[in-house]
Amino acid sequence: MRKIIIGSSLLFSILLAVPQAHAQESVDVIIHDNGTERREVIDLPKSMTYPVDSLLNDWKAKNYIDLGKDCSTSIVNPEFSDSIYIDRLSRMPTVMEMPYNEIVRKFIDMYTGRLRNQVAFMLSACNFYMPIFEEALDTYGLPLELKYLPIIESALNPSAVSRAGASGLWQFMLNTGKIYGLESNSLVDERRDPIKATWAAARYLKDMYAIYQDWNLVIAAYNCGPGTINKAIRRAGGKTDYWEIYNYLPKETRGYVPAFIAANYVMTYYCKHNICPMETNIPDATDTIQVNRNLHFEQIADVCGINMDEIKSLNPQYKRNIVPGDSKPRTLRLPINYISTFIDSQDTIYAHRSAELFKNRRTVSVANTRSTARSSKGKSSPQGEVIYHKNTQRRKPCRPSHAKYGVTVNQIKKLEWHEQHQN
């Protein structure tokens, strides 16, 4: 039996930062096993619940993706036998295994059935993101089929945010992102940066493979966290095959690997199911410049004449439309034909509406007023000094504050216990 040896420092950091599965919708699957049938309820990944209209709301999608005139997705979805699915999956040029069973079939049917318009959108959105994914995965020597993991995570929606707080194409949780170098604060969230998040995801996946040496376990851990996977392995008696620990996994994670296999299938064989990619126009070329001072998107839009939504789409990591260049040099991405305009007009841009857009004060003065109020402990002198008098009277016993407010000592101890454990 293969044993999994986990580096303690790496695993401890990751365990503190992994996302937890959150159910969105469920699907029923009938599983046949040794002549018997059983009903399996699986929670769907949230990405499979996004309506196509919401995916098309992104600025890039609005401007570069449309339904197309020459090719439209048919409502007719051909039915194929299990043997055909098995053959097609086995012929895919992948390092990761792509096995077939009733659960995988259920997810294939969903992608090629009621989610076929979503697939048509994602096929087009691949033109924006797949080159980024493939470069990072190839650099780290990872299987290129992992490029379809964001299909399960976010449906290639760069603005996706889960109820658990995961964000971006790769749905990084806040702490996981920080461990892998993604800055997050009130103004910046690099989990939303497609390029930086992709390279962070590649490092994370490589670290997970160093632990498990099994890609099914790696992508399952990406969904529910290595702590949950390790617990499932222990409950399964030390087995390290995803399908053998399947029943010990959370409901959503049970569907995560089958959904990943189905995503690889549908992105390869979409034509066999009469799915046509939406028409994609080539986006305008862009370039980056370094910003060393605080800068607001509205300053750029007003002076350079760039569409505000386009600036937001090109720089999704800046949460409040502010590039905080004062803290450290920052990268700003703009259409390439506006780069020279920005450079030539920098002084004008930085000065434009700066007092209106940046209202936080650098220094403040304390009001120079004298108090005329007197207390039992002192009084003001003519020069403004406070003269204190020692009170030598014996103090009366104070009534405990918990008695005053009707709170018991045990209740206070419980609150303190919870606070300590939360901290």
Question: Where do the PLM segments sit?
Answer:
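Extracytoplasmic and endomembrane cell-envelope/extracellular-matrix remodeling and assembly machinery
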Residues: I75-F121, N127-F128, T139-Y140, S184-L187, ...
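Hydrophobic h-region of N-terminal signal peptides that target proteins for export
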Residues: F12-P19
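Short glycine-biased active-site loop of nucleotidyltransferases that positions the nucleotide triphosphate
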Residues: A160-S162, V323-P324, H421-Q422
